[in-house]
Amino acid sequence: MDDKAFTKDLDQWVEQLNECKQLNENQVRTLCEKAKEILTKESNVQEVRCPVTVCGDVHGQFHDLMELFRIGGKSPDTNYLFMGDYVDRGYYSVETVTLLVALKVRYPERITILRGNHESRQITQVYGFYDECLRKYGNANVWKYFTDLFDYLPLTALVDGQIFCLHGGLSPSIDTLDHIRALDRLQEVPHEGPMCDLLWSDPDDRGGWGISPRGAGYTFGQDISETFNHANGLTLVSRAHQLVMEGYNWCHDRNVVTIFSAPNYCYRCGNQAAIMELDDTLKYSFLQFDPAPRRGEPHVTRRTPDYFL
């Protein structure tokens, strides 16, 4: 298929997905193959230019992603950087991740999608995405196309050399961004080690490194954040991965910010969501938003475990 015809198809797919209508299995396969070609050229520390709007977890809450685009501006008019966790827990993981990947393929320079800890084969089999694919497609092929694609997602991004963005947090195995650039990311998220830590770690009030209650990654204190930022010429670590009630939360004396973009998480947490706009001088402002009005929410009983909020 020539590029022009494919672009036309893509535009039609994006339009369809904007109405929360899933693509068919063959279309998903084609989309994921195209996405791999684009993502394979991206770095483990993907360079991003400002202005850009930085977003946290979305977790299959499709209507809230639509609200995010209403508040922050449509793609490609606004540049976006998403810090992972597109699937699981929400009712529309399929439509959510398909739309974000379609936008990436259509506007590769305008949207950056990083890997979260839920972009993994193992986690999606427990927290909903696998079951949703089975329910919506009658087999696991679409789940396989996406989880194979997840191995290609960049692990981190660097906005204008100063703001370091990633899903989880820092790692005792990593002192410099060059250490991250040297990792082999084309694999399932390991159970331990630097790649695991980047997607699983959390900042903590206690200094130094600590054991994470999540069972993967570490907790890291302000001393660690300050040392890392100073050593790498950074002004800020921007990350997601944790529910914060206001949608964003500063910690470590403003060395770290957490951004969470799924309002009323799991349809029951009552939190606001937020996104962080970085203008062309890297000045930041936060936009908070509440859940989109729900029409005819499917009645799905909670079958996924409560752990790992």
UniProtKB/Swiss-Prot annotation:
Enzyme class: hydrolase
Protein name: Serine/threonine-protein phosphatase 2A catalytic subunit beta isoform
Tagged with keyword Metal-binding: yes
Cofactor remark from the record: Binds 2 manganese ions per subunit.
Residues forming the catalytic site: H118 (proton donor)
GO CC aspect terms: chromosome, centromeric region; cytoplasm; cytosol; FAR/SIN/STRIPAK complex; nucleus; spindle pole
Phosphotyrosine PTM sites in chain numbering: Y307
Organism this protein belongs to: Bos taurus
Coiled-coil parts of chain: none
Residues bound to Mn(2+) 1: D57, H59, D85
The keyword Cell cycle belongs to this UniProt entry's keyword annotation: no
Family named by the database record: Belongs to the PPP phosphatase family. PP-1 subfamily.
Superkingdom of origin: Eukaryota
PROSITE patterns: SER_THR_PHOSPHATASE (PS00125)
Cofactor(s) it depends on: Mn(2+)
Modified how: Reversibly methyl esterified on Leu-309 by leucine carboxyl methyltransferase 1 (LCMT1) and protein phosphatase methylesterase 1 (PPME1). Carboxyl methylation influences the affinity of the catalytic subunit for the different regulatory subunits, thereby modulating the PP2A holoenzyme's substrate specificity, enzyme activity and cellular localization.
GO biological-process terms attached to the record: mitotic cell cycle
InterPro entries hit by this protein: Calcineurin-like_PHP_ApaH, Metallo-depent_PP-like, PPA2-like, Ser/Thr-sp_prot-phosphatase
